[in-house]
Structures are given as C-alpha cells and as structure tokens.
From Swiss-Prot:
GO terms for biological process: mismatch repair. InterPro entries: DNA_mismatch_repair_MutS, DNA_mismatch_repair_MutS-lik_N, DNA_mismatch_repair_MutS/MSH, DNA_mismatch_repair_MutS_C, DNA_mismatch_repair_MutS_clamp, DNA_mismatch_repair_MutS_core, DNA_mismatch_repair_MutS_N, DNA_mismatch_repair_MutS_sf. Gene3D superfamilies: 1.10.1420.10, 6.10.140.430, DNA repair protein MutS, domain I, MutS, connector domain, P-loop containing nucleotide triphosphate hydrolases. The keyword Plastid does not apply. The lineage of its organism: Bacteria, Pseudomonadati, Pseudomonadota, Gammaproteobacteria, Enterobacterales. ATP binds at G614, P615, N616, M617, G618, G619, K620, S621. Belongs to the DNA mismatch repair MutS family. GO terms for cellular component: cytosol. Keywords: ATP-binding, DNA damage, DNA repair, DNA-binding, Nucleotide-binding. This is DNA mismatch repair protein MutS. HAMAP family: MutS (MF_00096). The keyword DNA repair applies. This protein is involved in the repair of mismatches in DNA. It is possible that it carries out the mismatch recognition step. This protein has a weak ATPase activity. One of its GO terms (molecular function) is mismatched DNA binding.
Amino acid sequence: MSAIENFDAHTPMMQQYLKLKAQHPEILLFYRMGDFYELFYDDAKRASQLLDISLTKRGASAGEPIPMAGIPYHAVENYLAKLVNQGESVAICEQIGDPATSKGPVERKVVRIVTPGTISDEALLQERQDNLLAAIWQDSKGFGYATLDISSGRFRLSEPADRETMAAELQRTNPAELLYAEDFAEMSLIEGRRGLRRRPLWEFEIDTARQQLNLQFGTRDLVGFGVENAPRGLCAAGCLLQYAKDTQRTTLPHIRSITMEREQDSIIMDAATRRNLEITQNLAGGAENTLASVLDCTVTPMGSRMLKRWLHMPVRDTRVLLERQQTIGALQDFTAELQPVLRQVGDLERILARLALRTARPRDLARMRHAFQQLPELRAQLETVDSAPVQALREKMGEFAELRDLLERAIIDTPPVLVRDGGVIASGYNEELDEWRALADGATDYLERLEVRERERTGLDTLKVGFNAVHGYYIQISRGQSHLAPINYMRRQTLKNAERYIIPELKEYEDKVLTSKGKALALEKQLYEELFDLLLPHLEALQQSASALAELDVLVNLAERAYTLNYTCPTFIDKPGIRITEGRHPVVEQVLNEPFIANPLNLSPQRRMLIITGPNMGGKSTYMRQTALIALMAYIGSYVPAQKVEIGPIDRIFTRVGAADDLASGRSTFMVEMTETANILHNATEYSLVLMDEIGRGTSTYDGLSLAWACAENLANKIKALTLFATHYFELTQLPEKMEGVANVHLDALEHGDTIAFMHSVQDGAASKSYGLAVAALAGVPKEVIKRARQKLRELESISPNAAATQVDGTQMSLLSVPEETSPAVEALENLDPDSLTPRQALEWIYRLKSLV
C-alpha cells in the first residue's frame, strides 16, 4: 500500500490503521469506528465492488484524500456472509479502549478473523451442510490431507496414495477453504477451487505438527489416536490447527481428538462416480432429484449433515451396518412420536462449538435450554424400545438436569439477539443486578410523580416530563406558556412549538439512572461470561450428547423412509455378489408419474459380468445406477428399494457413465472417457462394483468396438470385478460364448410402425435390434430424414447381412463392410511378367504404376 511509504505524515488514527493493516495485508480489514466498520484504500475499493456499497473519500491524510467504504455494525453479519460466499476473508478490528480515558486514538485490535473455512456464526453457515477447513500436503510418497469442521470440532486426516484418490477426497469433502504449501507441485489438482490459501513451508513441519496436536489434546504422543504413523497427514493437520488458532484468536476446547480415515474402512468412490450417482448434487449442480433429496427427511440440521457424511463414506464393517439395520427395524413403530420431539432439539452441535469459542449468543443459550428440555421426554420414549443400540444411544444422550435448571434460572424466555442490548439475564438470578435494574426501571414512576408535582406547583397545564437519547431527561412547556417557566428551569433545547428545560433535581436523577443502566449492563455481561465458565466443564459430555442425538435423528429418519417408501432390509453375504429381487431406482421412482418397473439383478462369482443391450431411453443407465445406489444404501446401513437383496463385500464403486468435454483441461469427451476407464482398469478388484456405459464412443467404429471388447475381456477374465457393461456394439453379445462368468441381458421395447414403446423390463439374452431410428423419430428428427435413414439401413444390411455377427477377436472384421473394387495398379501387376522386362522397361513400369495409385 502506497500509504505506508510516508507513514509519519498520516494522522495518528490512520497510523494506527496502517499498522493493523500491515499485519493482515492479504485480507480485508473491518476497522471499528463508532457505529460503523470502515474500510480504507484498496480494501475500500474491493469491498465496494464485492458488496455493492458506496465508495467515498474521508478527508485527507498525508495530503491525499482517503478512499473509504463503511458498513453499520448492526448489519455486519449480512455483509460477512456475502464476502465469505465469495471466498473472501475478513479481519474484525474492534475498539477495546475506553474513549473517555484514551489520549489519542482509542486502542483497537483484531479480535477475530472470519474466513470461509473457520466460520461458526449461524448467519454465515448453511445449516444442512458441513463447512470444512482443509489442508493438503505432498511429498514423494503421496499426499497428506486433513479436514476440520470448526462448527462441530470434527477433525480428520488421511493419506491418499495417488492423484486420483486425492481428487476423490477433495470432491467428497468439498472444503470451503484449502491450505496448501508454497511449493505444492500438483497445482492442477486444486486450481479453480474456492478459498485457496498459500501457506509457508514451515507451517507443515512434522515436529511442529506433533507439538501443536499434543498441546491441543493435552497428550504426550498421538499413539492413542492411531495417527502416529501418518506423517504426511500430520503435516497437513499441524498447518490446519495453527491456522484455526490464528484466525479464532482463542482456545479451541471443542477440538479434543483427531481421527484417521483409512481406505480399507469405507467403500471408495472416485470423483466421477460421486458425480454420476448424483448422491448429494445433481449433474447440473443443484440438490433436486439426488439420493439425499429422497433419503433426507431428518428433523435437525446436525442429523442432515451426518446423513450426508454417511452417504459419501459408506462403511465396510458389517458389525456397524447390522447394528444400524437393527436400530432402524426397532425404531419403525416409534418414528411418529420421536420426530416431533427431535425437531425441537435444533442444531445443538453448532451451538456447542460457539459455546467453546465463547461466541455463543443469548438465543444460542435459549436454544440449548430448549434442547435440554426435550431430553426427559426423548429418554422416556426410547426406554420402551427393545434394542441394545438404541439404549446405548439413550445413555450417551444424557439428561443434563442441572444445566437445564441453570439456564432456566439465568436466561429470560425470549432473549434479545446480542448481550450488549441488555435484558438477557432473568430477574431473580442475581440480587445485585436486580437492584441496579430496579433503580433504572423505577424512572417511570419517578417521572410521573415529578410531572404531577411540577404541574401543580407552576400551574402550567402543558408541562410534560420526558426523555430522549440525545438530550436525556427534560421538562417540556409549550411555546405559549414558556414565558411563565420558573427561574430555576434551565433551558436545554428549543423546539418549534415548545421549550425544554432541566432542573438540578432531574439532572441528579438522570446521572443516577444512567449510571445504574451502565452498571446493570456491565454486570449482565459479566454474568453472561460466567455462564460460559459454568457450562464449558461439561463440553465433552454435551458434544457426545449432540452426536447421539444427530445419529438418532438419522436412524429415525431412515426408519421412516423405509416404512413410507416400502424399502426392505438387505442381507450381507460373505462371497462377492449382488442378488436383487424387484429392485427400483430410489430417485427415479419418486419423480415418475407412473409406477416404476422393478427389475431383478444377479451377479455372483459364476456370473460376474452382465452385457446390457437395448434401445436408447430403454432404461439401461437407470438399471445400472439403481444397482450402485442400492449397494451404496446397503452400506450405510439403510433399508433399500427392492423386494429382497443379498449383497457381498464391496471395496469400491466405479462408474463410467456419460461424459462431457472437460474444456478447462483441454480434454475431449473421448479423452475423459478413456481417463476414467484407465482408472477403473488400474484400480478395480474382484470386490469392486463397476458400471461401464457405452465405452468406445467418440472414435471410429472399429477403434471403439475393439476398445470396448478388450475392456470387457479384461474386467471379466483378469480383474473379475462385478460389472454391468452397457453397449450398443452387438458384437459384444458374443462374449458369453467365449468366456466364463459373462451373461447377456437386455431391456425390452415394442415397435409398431414409426412408434416405439419402452418396456423398461430386463430380460435374459441379447437385444434383437437397437431401435435407433424409432428413437430418432420420437426425438423429432424430420420424417424425410428418417425415411432416407431407413433406405440407407436396408442398403447397408443387404451389403453386409452378417454385420451383427462380426467376429472381433478373429480376422473377420466385416461390420458394415463394402466389397472393395480391384485397384487398376493391382490389375496391371497381375498381367505383368517381370522376367520379360528390360531394365529400362522396368523403370517405365514403376512410373506407370505410380500414376495408377
């Protein structure tokens, strides 16, 4: 900033500003001045554009007018929300000195830094979505990745082994803010992400990280957390924790542990799979018609966030899954009673985080009290549920009768938004506070008595006693009677139709009342802070309770969904395979206006791959996706949309379904498709579920068919993954004859003239035709074009009647082949006798042949 160059020429206040700004050069500085937060110089210019506020000038400092923009302090949350949503960070600078006793500028300091990944204020957060701060580290052995949800205290780390896994983690967690080292090599992995923050290398130093984490958790080592042997993850976690402390400017008592996320604990889904399955976000970027939109009828924001975490991280431990299934089954008869009570609990998880950060507002404490008031009824309802997991949740929930009583005594029923407004602490909680309030509140009676007395004494019927914020207490007399005012009345203010006066007695009372109001407010703030001190020792138990309540909300919700949507409980088996009877797509069945056609599926060690053929729009993609979604739902412990499901172990779910050009990276549709295919062929195992849709489009027919054949062969013979392979290459329907474990299925359609009816029903065997022209007609392609296409199709079929039976793995490759005419050069060579040529004739023949080619 050029203003710093001539620092001494500035006014004392601007010098103070410039010193503070120099400590936070990269971010906006909100500088408190009275009832406004002001921004100066480049900050003012940026803020005026980002917030659409006026850019003005403030006087001059160092001989130059100062660009300035300001926002009222009472509206700061709205403006912070706008900035955070745009990925900006803001340092909040408050007046901490007393203007009455300050010589020179009032003392100010930055009390907190608001960044996209470290916000905890209710107004700034999306209530049904996690808001994560993340850090990424890389060395020659792989990546380290850590995430922290400061609004709950949830702290995780992992060590993705390769670029694809790291990309999948970034997509799964979708951090609001991402810290990376200044020498980070894989910038293409993170560029374009919101909230990127470049950090110095020393912040990722391993010894510093261990020290920071041990200090935070009050431990001597990290063995108990299972992260001791995760150096890359610890480097990321250390940087992240330091950044959180720097921005919050306070201790973080709600962050009490760190958890290692291991690949083998959950079903791995890469970025393409999460996108294609539309788990929490549809392909257009919205939340409609996603799996979460169907499954999430939770009644608390913290329950909704937990369900989304489950959906993005299905667990492989069948003990956990069976426990969830048992709980859902046990709760099905109790959902109608439990959900209304759970709804009253609210977002206890985030309230506790604000309590830990000492930023909880009066209404947070009122909501906490309301949550505590629900616990006795919840516990009573759960007591009758015959389920050990439910009873374990009930115990973890606690009751907190003492804390409930404390908050009932301390906080009024409907407190104001801010403690600085006063009127938060209930009457009867503190005797001294009640005395100061009585003095302040007794003013009304006193003023009424004074008004009656002065009217009688002076005989002036227009005399009134009042108060305003600028001039304080006054006695008002109309202009017509003002000349009759007693001599001891001192003029305080002249109005158009009246005069206002003060008398020594009223002035003395005013000082007393204002002092009592100030004393009452100061004491109220002190008592409010003391409430934090009384609540914080119970923080760990309160966090466990919030976690149990969120889990109960998720499980009650899944029980309600299972009953309402006619889902069934899947059975887990030991061998790889998926057997589905009458399976349905959980999302499509909800948006259809007609009954959904349920379909079976059978994959087993003896039947590992299904080649799926049938018309476009016939339902191939729906059938494939519904299989993956049923598997995903089973592995979060949910019931599933089917009549019966048996499912074996799954380590990964892959989808190669649909593609679009990745223009930003300069990759064509075909390149995107091949990159995703390569990832599957490198990483799939016999326990993986693989969906492959239309491999080989975007290149020549022979290239595409050859690639599709080779991929299918590799998946069936070598990898032996559970595979659904949809294709338009009818040649692939010969695969079952050539290798074991492969079967044909098709989706049916009926054609009548130019019309087609899709049956959406899966049948064994290959499709008889693709119905491409009928689908084109349905799409509105002009009739003359369809007619010409039929004519051309008959021509091609007459030329190559066996096109559908082309042998891909042999030498015969006659797909749509046309008999070639004999070349003139070949004819000439066939009639040539080389032994009869002279050298000169031979040379002439070479030139003649050259002209024929």
